[in-house]
A protein has these predicted regions:
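S-adenosyl-L-methionine
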Residues: 1-158
Length: 158
């Protein structure tokens, strides 16, 4: 009963969505020959990607912001997911990313993941409102999978 799982069904993805997600997921996952079969399934014949922590961080934030929008979250709801204490105060009983928040504040002087995820969410929202495509500062991606995007993509036409 996949309908009960908390993620969008493949039919919910448009070809544009797939073009956004697939190269990012491939680059995050395919960093070793151990997962060659996964890369091949996506249509990638090149080698594994280098482990670049800054690039990986940004790709993860792009995906997080993309999925927050795909789920239909408002900015305030997305902020609540990232840092409920900012909305409800420091005594709010639950935080999803408290340990990450503390580590990043200690290391960077800010909750960097929250800031970048919100900035990307805002930029994606601006692009959607202007009816233009979000362009990543990482473009062009190291891999292009357009040729591999076809029948495996969901039938959604969002």
């Amino acid at each position: 009963h996949l309908d009960q799982l908390p993620f969008p069904q493949p039919t919910h993805f448009s070809k544009e969505d797939s073009r956004f997600v697939r190269p990012r997921v491939l680059e995050l996952v395919f960093t070793s020959e151990d997962v060659r079969a996964f890369a091949t399934d996506l249509g990638w014949e090149g080698g594994p990607f280098a482990w670049d922590p800054q690039r990986r961080f940004f790709i993860q934030c792009e995906l997080d912001a993309f999925y927050a929008r795909l789920y239909g979250l408002t900015r305030e709801e997305w902020l609540f997911v990232l840092d409920p204490a900012e909305i409800h105060g420091e005594k709010y009983p639950g935080e999803s990313f408290r340990v990450l928040k503390e580590k990043e504040i200690s290391r960077y002087g800010e909750f960097r993941t929250k800031r970048v995820c919100l900035e990307l969410f805002d930029e994606m929202e601006r692009c959607a409102a202007a009816r233009c495509s979000y362009v990543s500062p990482l473009e062009p991606f190291l891999c292009t999978l357009d040729e591999a995007i076809g029948d495996n993509v969901g039938a959604g036409d969002r």
